[in-house]
Amino acid sequence: MSSLLEQLIEAFRVLPGVGQKSAQRMAYHVLEREREGGRRLATTLANAVEKVGHCVQCRDFTESEICTICASSSRDRQQLCVVESPADRLAIEHATGYRGLYFVLQGRLSPLDGIGPRELGLDRLGERLAAGEVTEMIIATNATVEGEATAHYLAQLARQHAVRPSRLAQGMPLGGELEYVDRGTLSHAFGTRSEVL
């Protein structure tokens, strides 16, 4: 196998969920059938790596200093939704009518992996809360051990700045049937049930 082909296969392996076989299939596909697509991919990837950075206010991906959401005058500046990743921000933006601002952690607290408050930009988040414009922090971290630890830390940070923390509801999926829901989810949903209004 040629050295360039091996390098291409290894390059594809940096993508999440792509193992040796998938990377090999992708490399062969690009070289056998999609050379023009491969050139376009290479050019676009190089441009994105060079030009896409982080918004100075929310840490989401952007090509400018401030992203379009933070720059928008139509957003509610009193609400701040904290998410783990740009993909989480996009999911909320597409699935809800949320009109507030965001703060993207780019991860979650994980001391064993060397990810602490500094790596998540929580000093910048603290400064933003201290400015006094935000009145509610919506904590939208994942329901994992690290996500829950991060949510707890965020709630404490919000309270230190007299900001009301709230957490996304968790539990039964819409349209889900009880018999198919796992025990942990069902237990959590039952324990955090709310009054029907």
Swiss-Prot record:
Instruction: Give the ZnF (C4-type) ranges.
Output: 55-70
Gene Ontology biological-process entries: DNA recombination; DNA repair
- One Pfam family this chain carries? Toprim_4
Q: Which GO terms describe its molecular function?
A: DNA binding; zinc ion binding
Q: Does the keyword ATP-binding apply?
A: no
* Domain Toprim span(s) in chain numbering: 78-173
- Database matches in InterPro entries: DNA_Rcmb_RecR, Rcmb_RecR, Rcmb_RecR_Znf, TOPRIM_dom, TOPRIM_RecR
Sorted keywords for this record are:
DNA damage, DNA recombination, DNA repair, Metal-binding, Zinc, Zinc-finger
Its biological purpose is as follows: May play a role in DNA repair. It seems to be involved in an RecBC-independent recombinational process of DNA repair. It may act with RecF and RecO.
Family designation: Belongs to the RecR family.
Q: Please state what the protein is called.
A: Recombination protein RecR
